[in-house]
């Protein structure tokens, strides 16, 4: 790997006669996460963290498309949304980027806490609470508990789906009042006059 341009190697095993510097660690996975968190913290950048049972990717794409009209935006590619993919996405950031739109996927308790420590989002968005990963999370209440671990470390705003029966019960978390979006007029930010135009896309008014 040194011949291919690597500045150093991170390894769980001692290397015999290494051809360059290497860092010996107990866990390369944990080292990946720690280095990513350090790198993210070194950048003057705003981070939007997106999670939810369904709709994460389309929400990420929409938010990134809107923000990119004014800012230099980096977004999660493919399904790089777990404890390996998220750090790799963060390593793609440069000083030229102004906003990162990061998808954050989990399947068990504690994962969101670890992801949030890495990403350190300024804003978090939760699309909904559905019936995914029940093998570990057991119920929608379990999914709600796991997803809302993101509230512990979000820096500024919490944006929630006000049409979701589990999410709309949240009034305040860690001193922050959620901003609600949805299809119903009871949400401060909602959609009206939805028109589906087939291959031309969908049109709507945001109120």
Description of each model-found segment:
Residues 26, 133, 193:
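Pocket-edge structural micro-motifs
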Residues 9-16, 162-166, 183-184:
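Short, polar loop motifs at secondary-structure junctions
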Residues 25, 76, 181:
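Hydrophobic residues at beta-strand termini and immediately following loops
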Residues 140-141, 172, 176-207:
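Adenine nucleotide phosphate-binding catalytic loops in nucleotide-utilizing enzymes
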Residues 14, 30-162, 168-177:
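Phosphate-binding loop of NTP-binding sites
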Residues 15, 28, 79, 184-186, ...:
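Short, solvent-exposed coil/turn elements at secondary-structure transition points
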Residues 1-34:
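N-terminal leader/targeting and accessory segments in enzymes
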